Amino acid sequence: MLAKRTISSLVIIVVGIAFVIAGGWVFALGITLVIALAASEYSRMFAQGGYYPSFPVLIAGSSLTTLFAANPESELLLLAFSLSVLTAIAYHVFQFSKHQDTGGMDLAATLSGLVFIGFLGSYLARLRFLPLGHFWIILAVAPAGISDI
């Protein structure tokens, strides 16, 4: 088990450093893929617990928020995040009759996923576009990656 985790960690480190060095839209698309996978895992985790967070809204909202974070115009990031939140609220209002027992928790899980994965994760994309961004992104991500081994 430890050998398998070490090999997967090495692959992730190599691919991650390649994305960081490439920079630009290659990095933005790579980090968007990572954020989408994180949102998918988050949604499945709640689904196993008997809750129903909105899988499509979490994936699309987190991905769009991260993609628009790569743009220097911060208004697009806020627009994408705001539309994601409004879409999540509308989705759960319409789905409330199907899941009345867990409706509030479903909405809370979706909104917290959008905030903690989508909005805060989008700052990884913004961090790379700072001067010396490759240094800052490696400095920010390396301790978390190393501690996960």
Label each PLM-derived region with a short phrase.
Residues 2-149:
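Membrane-embedded alpha-helical bundles of polytopic integral membrane proteins
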